[in-house]
Swiss-Prot record:
UniProt-annotated binding residues for NAD(+): 10-34
Catalytic machinery residues: 151 (proton acceptor)
Alphabetized GO MF terms: alcohol dehydrogenase (NAD+) activity
CDD domains reported for this sequence: ADH_SDR_c_like
Designated name of the protein: Development-specific 25 kDa protein
Lineage: Eukaryota, Metazoa, Ecdysozoa, Arthropoda, Hexapoda
Oxidoreductase as UniProt keyword: yes
Keyword terms: Oxidoreductase
Gene Ontology CC annotation, any one: cytoplasm
Keyword rRNA-binding (UniProt): no
Binding-site residues for substrate, renumbered to this chain: 138
Family: Belongs to the short-chain dehydrogenases/reductases (SDR) family.
InterPro entries, A to Z: ADH_Ceratitis-type (IPR002426), NAD(P)-bd_dom_sf (IPR036291), Sc_DH/Rdtase_CS (IPR020904), SDR_fam (IPR002347)
Length: 258
């Protein structure tokens, strides 16, 4: 089970949706620091987080994970403040298939670069104490997403990265557990902004598929956050969880080579 006591937690993500809801829930834990890394600062949201628990120091570091130099600068600032990281939550996501490079950068390469740059400050054989990396993916990282194939491909890649980093040999060396959380359809700002079908017209034959996606029953960010916290509390290396209106469920991907 996860021990939150005196931990330095880094959340890389925005100030809306289930990621921010998770931050609110984590603030009730006996952490030492919560550092929010995002492209834009939201002073009011940071104040609301701090008000939940004045014993946990809330900090903000600007970081754009689609920009390698910004990640380098952001990680340096974080480590300058706290020295090491115990929990890293990769919570950035972007659904904009028309912009292939940005979609891949936000959902895959940014996640990889951010994780690898923080690893020396988590790895117990280097400057860290061990810990946990939690990457927020999507059910469309587990199954095809024909209405948004680029997004789906990037999320598949993120899960592949997580599973590879969770290798037992690496885990025993570094002390860093890796897990992935895959929310099902959630009524976040990311999804609600896509109700205008015009944005999908550049993808041939996608309108009907996208309508089916948007007509599906969605969980609220609050429901998703509760399930995510339950999953994180398990602190199980290599675990992949689906969070949906049905609750939280651990899944086991097929292994083809032994």
């Amino acid at each position: 089970m996860m021990d939150w006591n005196n931990k330095n937690v880094v959340y890389v993500g925005g100030f809306s949706g289930f990621g921010y809801q998770v931050c609110q829930m984590m603030m009730k834990k006996p952490m030492k620091h919560l550092i929010v890394c995002s492209r834009m600062e939201n002073v009011e949201m940071l104040k609301k987080l701090q008000a939940i628990n004045t014993s946990v120091k809330v900090m903000f570091v600007q970081m754009n994970i689609a920009d390698y130099a910004s990640i380098v600068k952001g990680v340096k600032q974080v480590i300058g403040h706290v020295g090491h990281v115990d929990v890293l939550i990769n919570g950035v996501g972007g659904l904009a298939d028309k912009d292939v490079e940005t979609t891949v950068a936000v959902n895959l390469t940014g996640l990889i670069n951010t994780t690898l740059m923080f690893m020396p400050y988590m790895d117990k054989t280097q400057s860290g104490h061990g810990g946990m990396v939690v990457s927020i993916s999507s059910v469309y990282g587990l199954e095809p997403g024909p209405a948004f194939s680029v997004y789906s491909a990037a999320k598949h890649g993120g899960i592949g990265f997580t599973r590879s980093m969770a290798d037992e040999h690496l885990y025993h060396k570094t002390g860093v557990a890796f897990m992935c959380i895959c929310p099902a359809m959630t009524s976040t700002e990311l999804m609600m902004n896509k109700r205008d079908m015009n944005w999908m017209k550049w993808v041939p034959h996608s309108e009907e598929m996208w309508k089916m996606v948007m007509d599906a029953k969605m969980q609220t960010p609050e429901e998703c956050a509760v399930n995510m916290m339950t999953a994180m509390e398990q602190a199980k290396n290599g675990a992949i969880y689906i969070c949906s209106t049905s609750g939280m469920k651990e899944i086991t991907p097929t292994v083809y080579m032994h």
